A protein has these predicted regions:
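Acidic-basic catalytic patches of nuclease active cores, encompassing PD-(D/E)XK
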Residues: 1-30, 94
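Nucleic-acid nuclease catalytic cores
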Residues: 74-102
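Conserved catalytic cores of phosphodiester-cleaving nucleases, focusing on short active-site segments
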Residues: 39-41, 45-58
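Helix-rich interaction surfaces within compact, conserved domain-sized segments
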Residues: 7-20, 100-123
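Short, conserved beta-strand edge motifs with alternating hydrophobic and charged residues
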Residues: 28, 49-52, 87
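A generic beta-sheet turn/junction motif
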Residues: 32, 43-45, 90
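Mg2+/Mn2+-dependent nuclease catalytic core
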Residues: 55-72
Length: 123
């Protein structure tokens, strides 16, 4: 239950950060059937699909990406939307890593991102 609370708190925090940056941000909180993403953020005609993950152990294992998330993010891209992102919170920093980047790393056999990778691939 602690992980769920950490995740929910991070989703709320990220929505507040996005709103402060001028985005309209909506958190798909309290979803019973499991949505494929946590947040949609819109600004200047661009919509961003974001899944927020807390990385308590300084790694983001790709096994945490669910199949329905991959399918939804692929469809999001096919519909000509902006690339979806994973917002990774690690050591009180937030790293925005693009889904296409992660998908490419998975194809190359990578199993996770460590803190060094988050700094390298994140914005």
């Amino acid at each position: 239950m602690i992980n769920k609370k950490l995740g929910n708190d991070f989703e709320q925090e990220l929505c507040e950060i996005l709103a402060d940056a001028g985005y309209w941000a909506h958190n798909f909180a309290n979803r019973k059937n499991g949505q494929p993403a946590d947040i949609i953020a819109v600004k200047s005609g661009g919509a961003y699909l974001i899944d927020a993950k807390v990385c308590s152990y300084e790694v983001f294992p790709f096994r945490r990406i669910e199949e329905n998330q991959q399918l939804a993010m692929d469809m999001w891209i096919e519909c000509n939307n902006i690339e979806p992102y994973f917002a990774l919170k690690c050591r009180n920093e937030i790293y925005m890593v693009g889904y296409i980047t992660i998908k490419g790393l998975i194809k190359k056999g990578k199993k996770q991102l460590n803190l060094e990778d988050m700094n390298k691939y994140g914005t």
